[in-house]
Amino acid sequence: MTIIPVNNTIMNSVTYVLYSEDVDYCVLIDCGEYETLKPMLDKMGKKVKAVLLTHGHSDHIYGLNQLLEAYPDVMVCTTEDGHREIQDAKLNFSYLHDDPFAVKGYKKKVLTDGQTVSFDGLEDIDVIATPGHDSSCLSYKLGMNLFTGDAYIPGVKVFYKFPRGNKELALSSYEMLANMQKEGFHIYCAHHTY
């Protein structure tokens, strides 16, 4: 399994491309700028099969509409709350920016804590609920790799003062993920460093 980080210009978010040479597709963790992703996807020659969202805030989904135009069969995977957020410009906070948007008309998969997501030819991905920054926050475990979104950015205090944030849950999720890092998991967070 190969993991490629793609740095986006909006809010320094990071999209991760997961793929294997053995299959003709890839899976994304979050979806940043499609203009940044497209050249890489074209060069790889792989179609996008699914996007696993760490949560539904606009900086993690702002390229999703363009991606879905190019790859209409993409499965968008997140919690029920996450699906509500991406379908509403106010809930995903894009209304605060120049170009508010909502994502509509897509293939939906609801993820829950403890679930395992499987794709032929790729390692299984374990879903871990990590609420607090937002109620929709998920982290993904792939072998000894841990994709934490905004729930855990090493050395950065978790921000939980959004309408669907929760201080106690945020601190609990942060502590759990920090302990996993101490156990040897490699952290792939959604901003700053990876």
Task: Specify the residue positions occupied by each region the protein language model found.
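A structural micro-motif
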Residues: M1, K46, V74, E123-I125, ...
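Conserved beta-strand hairpin/beta-sheet module of binuclear metal-dependent hydrolase folds
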Residues: M1-M44, L138-G149, P154
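Short acidic-hydrophobic surface loop/beta-edge motif
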Residues: V6, L18, Q115-G121
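Short Gly/Pro-enriched turn/cap motifs at secondary-structure boundaries
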Residues: V6-N8, K107-K108, I128-P131
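Short catalytic-loop micro-motif centered on adjacent basic/acidic residues
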Residues: C26-I29, A50-L52, V127-A129
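Residue-level marker for buried hydrophobic side chains located in beta-strands
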Residues: V27, L52, V76, L146-T148, ...
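Active-site HxH/HxHxD metal-binding segment of metal-dependent hydrolases
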Residues: E33-S118
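Metallo-beta-lactamase
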Residues: D124-Y194
